[in-house]
Regions:
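N-terminal alpha-helical targeting/anchoring segments
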Residues: 10-14, 18-33, 37-213
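TRNA-recognition modules of translation machinery and tRNA-sensing kinases, especially anticodon-binding
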Residues: 97-100, 113-117, 206-543
Length: 543
């Protein structure tokens, strides 16, 4: 019995000793870098333990404080091609920006003059300070106060020179800041492929022959709208959304909700087959990220484009956040402030997300229903390519990725049996970031108009996809660089983006073009049926 008690006592002493050792070790916490401390807030493990089991590659991905990436506009190129940038502003309907290139040249010239103006006072300040130091040493060594008056004069002169130098330096800094502001405000240069003006160029058709159009084209029926069809079949509910949220929102119900998910999964599947990697991005971003991608809170007509999120008083010091209008914004920012190894290019991502648009402005018959809404699901394609010119190394360029985008869009819309046309968009329709853009529009039967014995096809087309080449516009503003690969010097990659699936618009087009008036059903495109339980037609929901 005594032996057991002694053993228990020894065990307790051992436990106490181990616990004391643990406390002493814990009090001597080793140095942990700031990044690891920040990431530790989300990690239940203590710093020493986490560092012991964390690879160096993971530590490179730790959470960093939110700071806007430093933009690097190509000021040298703007100065060397000022006339081209001025014309580009006019062509792209940015008349107020047309004087910016010349103003940038003037400010840079002024900055150079100021640099020259600084040389004399800085040199004189150095001389005066050396003289002051020499006189001060003499006074200290010899106890001579006769030079005090001279010292006072020299110090006054030095102060005057410093004040003048400070004023010149301040003005030079102002010039530099203004040059950057003006340069970042300029729209991207347009591609030679982009038509100048307001009219797009017709590239071709998908599932449509103008000489032999579908039968419904010859008998326009405004009642054949996706709103009427979707409501009668129990697929769309605008009444409830008007109660819950207001104009511009909707409920997709029954097979309508299934059709939405089928479109998402099908488009993701096609993109993956083409080598694009799936990503699920956030729908809230820092406002400076949206701006760096070329999305302004208001357009050139001062109409609201982006919703910002109101911050509480305790968060006022934090960066403003906004609702993303497209997954293009968070996807582009995945490499903000980072270097991409040249060997990793091209990078091709596809992401489905909820998108939010303020969509300010008038609302007409051609934008009713699902066509223009405030919140919707969209599958977006985004890619980075090297900015080097194609050569013997077979570098994948932005033109290559752009062609890949278009082939994915064409495959999806062709398989959905939607009548489409492909347009090369004009300069006035490019926005700020795009150098080149192609849209694909679907023929909406409800938009057909007849008059004087003819049917107006032009009014029936509605955009469902868009693809853009942004060259280095976004990467310069997001601080994304390429290092290594086919060249030693660092450079800014090109970015491309495009719509794989704008769900509500394509869903609306399927309802209108796939509607069988005689049977009162909508034919489900064969490629979507596997995601809808084999359903071939959508009939009226009896419940």
């Amino acid at each position: 019995m005594m032996t057991n008690q002694k053993a228990d006592m020894n065990f307790s002493i051992l436990q106490l000793s181990l616990f004391t050792t643990f406390l002493m070790a814990s009090s001597r916490t080793p140095y942990v870098c700031l990044n690891c401390r920040l990431s530790n807030k989300l990690n239940p493990l203590s710093s020493p333990i986490r560092r012991r089991f964390t690879s160096s590659s993971y530590r490179q991905q730790v959470i960093r404080p939110a700071t806007a990436p430093k933009p690097t506009p190509n000021i040298k190129h703007i100065c060397q091609n000022a006339d081209a940038y001025t014309k580009n502003c006019i062509d792209r309907n940015y008349p107020s920006h047309a004087e910016y290139p010349l103003r940038i040249q003037q400010l840079l010239e002024e900055s150079r003059r100021l640099d020259q103006d600084l040389k004399t006072p800085r040199s004189r300040i150095k001389q005066v300070e050396q003289t002051i130091a020499k006189l001060a040493r003499q006074n200290a060594q010899q106890g001579d106060t006769n030079s005090d008056e001279e010292l006072a004069r020299l110090r006054a002169e030095a102060q005057q020179l410093k004040d003048k130098s400070h004023a010149v330096t301040t003005r030079k800094s102002t010039c530099t800041d203004e040059v950057h502001r003006l340069a970042l405000s300029l729209p991207n240069l347009s591609s030679p492929e982009t038509p100048v003006g307001h009219d797009p160029k017709l590239i071709g058709y998908i599932n449509f022959d103008p000489q032999s159009p579908p039968e419904y084209v010859s008998r326009p029926d405004p009642a054949r709208s996706h709103v009427a069809i979707g409501t009668s079949l129990g697929l769309i509910d605008f009444t409830s959304s008007a109660t819950t949220t207001g104009w511009g929102w909707y409920f997709l119900t029954n097979e309508g909700a299934l059709l939405e998910q089928a479109l998402i999964q099908y488009s993701l599947n096609v993109a993956r087959r083409h080598g694009w990697k799936p990503v699920s991005p956030p729908s809230i971003v820092y406002s400076y990220i949206a701006e760096a991608c070329g999305f302004q809170p208001r357009d050139q007509h001062n109409e609201q484009q982006i919703w910002t999120i109101e911050q509480s008083e305790k968060d006022k010091s934090k960066p403003q956040r906004s609702l993303a209008g497209t997954a293009e914004i968070p996807l582009a920012a995945m490499y903000a402030g980072r270097d991409i190894p040249g060997s990793d290019l091209p990078i091709k991502l596809v992401g489905a997300s909820r998108c939010y648009r303020a969509e300010a402005g008038s609302r007409g018959v051609d934008t009713k229903g699902l066509y223009r809404v405030h919140e919707f699901t969209k599958v977006e394609l985004f890619g980075w390519s090297d900015s080097l010119s194609p050569d013997a190394t077979s570098t994948v360029t932005s033109d290559t990725l752009f062609a890949d985008l278009l082939s994915i869009q064409s495959e999806i819309l062709t398989s959905l049996n939607l009548p489409c046309r492909i347009l090369e968009m004009p300069t006035t329709d490019l926005g700020a970031s795009a150098s080149r853009k192609q849209d694909i529009e679907v023929l909406f039967p409800s938009r057909l108009r007849s008059g004087s014995g003819n049917v107006d096809l032009e009014s029936a087309w509605g955009e469902v996809t868009s693809s853009s080449i942004c060259t280095d516009y976004q990467s310069r503003r997001l601080g994304t660089r390429v290092r290594g690969g086919a060249a030693k010097e660092s450079r800014f990659p090109h970015t491309v983006n495009g719509t794989a699936m704008a769900v509500p618009r394509v869903l609306a087009a399927i309802l209108e073009t796939g509607y069988d008036a005689e049977r009162g059903v909508v034919v489900v495109p064969p490629v979507l049926r596997s995601w809808m339980g084999g359903m071939e037609v959508i009939v009226e929901n009896e419940s």
